[in-house]
Amino acid sequence: MQLNSTEISELIKQRIAQFDVVSEAHNEGTIVSVSDGIIRVHGLADVMQGEMIALPGNRYAIALNLERDSVGAVVMGPYADLAEGMKVKCTGRILEVPVGRGLLGRVVNTLGEPIDGKGPVEHDGFSAVEAIAPGVIERQSVDQPVQTGYKSVDAMIPIGRGQRELVIGDRQTGKTALAVDAIINQRDSGIKCIYVAVGQKASTIANVVRKLEEHGALANTIVVVASASESAALQYLAPYAGCAMGEYFRDRGEDALIIYDDLSKQAVAYRQISLLLRRPPGREAFPGDVFYLHSRLLERAARVNAEYVETFTKGEVKGKTGSLTALPIIETQAGDVSAFVPTNVISITDGQIFLESNLFNAGIRPAVNPGISVSRVGGAAQTKIMKKLSGGIRTALAQYRELAAFSQFASDLDDATRKQLSHGQKVTELLKQKQYAPMSVATQSLVLFAAERGYLEDVELAKVGGFEAALMAYVDREHADLMQQINQTGAYNDEIEGKLKGILDTFKATQSW
């Protein structure tokens, strides 16, 4: 078969017309150095701050230093096989994590990947880990309570929905225990919980997850893990990832509670990254923007108004406010709250719960020091009954501390002073509480009523715990309806006062403890 020149030229023209080049523009660069999880890349002209850079082997790095002739990026994951000369690409994307209800009851890593062996995570889309906090106009004042289930916290240092309340103290003072109990207490409150574990041992995190499961609270909780064995980059990003997951509920008119355990370890991870990127060190070798590291995270915890929720959901949710409440944890060294990171976070948050090792070792648990613990906005969120009955508790404890310091030097004390000391000791004893045993508003109110109205005067100090346990069992058995009513309304009036008085009078007359 012979082709003439006309046919050949026609065929070539046809092929040229059909030919289509699919070109994909990539901003590509070359790794010029790798050390300690930090890569320097040359040739990335259009990279953004915080952009994900695609590495060989389906891994990513995050661009943190944009310099004149190179980009400093931190690798998320293993980096031992990365070498000079390898090609990397810009993705044009900021780091995002999966969000949605499907994450509840799951344990995930910083990137939202499941690590609990329960299969893939169902999600409702992705959300950027870095987000701008709601503005002043979009917020609403805090006026609804978050009950932790701890008498000492709910009475003296109340927490409201949308508040940031710092939990601060030395190691082994019960900070995580307080946070975990607060999560357990939200089982039936409708508040979704996120627990972010940063730089902790995997065995400790596994224990927390097991306890949440035992007490039926895991189904309502997302656990985000960046354990001590993870890279500094993942430890630094974990709180932001957890916050993005919490904002999903906040922006849809629901309430969420997030625990950052703890931000001291996140600051140390960020310091490590910054020093490896050769950023100039400041106080305690932290970089200059360590305040911004925590402020941009904690400002995202807020109560947003109904207009914000309606606009965000495009009219699907109307008349509902949303909130994200944060309980950041900070670990101090030898009780030094004036160190750099603790003072930063104290100034960012709306109050702090200070846990003291001396109190913890003396058997006063939770080891809350009511003298320097404060809640700046939670008072407006307290239920009416708690507000009414908790007023005298803080005063009684303050007077007791003052007199206790005094009485060490005085040999003979008058009756009024003795009475005040005895009352203070009994209130201190009454505020003790076992772990994993959060109390409802009604039972807390009854106990506070007993302390406030002098029902403990003739109870021996050693029997205060027994008195409380017997009282709890008695009201559960005989007055469950009243307890339910108080839990639902939180109201306090002459009728409820009379009923509480009647319960205690009958209990003291007929029961033993």
From Swiss-Prot:
Membrane topology: Peripheral membrane protein
A GO term from the CC aspect: plasma membrane
Presence of the UniProt keyword Membrane in the record: yes
InterPro entries: ATP_synth_asu-like_sf, ATP_synth_asu_C, ATP_synth_asu_C_sf, ATP_synth_F1_a_nt-bd_dom, ATP_synth_F1_asu, ATPase_a/bsu_AS, ATPase_F1/V1/A1_a/bsu_N, ATPase_F1/V1/A1_a/bsu_N_sf
Positions that bind ATP: 169-176
Root EC class: translocase
Subcellular location: Cell inner membrane
Site, Required for activity: residue positions: 373
Catalyzed reactions per annotation: ATP + H2O + 4 H(+)(in) = ADP + phosphate + 5 H(+)(out)
EC number, as in UniProt: 7.1.2.2
Single GO term (MF): proton-transporting ATP synthase activity, rotational mechanism
A Pfam family per the record: ATP-synt_ab_N
Record key words, sorted: ATP synthesis, ATP-binding, Cell inner membrane, Cell membrane, CF(1), Hydrogen ion transport, Ion transport, Membrane, Nucleotide-binding, Translocase, Transport
Complex formation: F-type ATPases have 2 components, CF(1) - the catalytic core - and CF(0) - the membrane proton channel. CF(1) has five subunits: alpha(3), beta(3), gamma(1), delta(1), epsilon(1). CF(0) has three main subunits: a(1), b(2) and c(9-12). The alpha and beta chains form an alternating ring which encloses part of the gamma chain. CF(1) is attached to CF(0) by a central stalk formed by the gamma and epsilon chains, while a peripheral stalk is formed by the delta and b chains.
Stated family: Belongs to the ATPase alpha/beta chains family.
Cited function: Produces ATP from ADP in the presence of a proton gradient across the membrane. The alpha chain is a regulatory subunit.
Protein name stated in the entry: ATP synthase subunit alpha
Species in which this protein is naturally found: Edwardsiella ictaluri (strain 93-146)
Record gene name: atpA
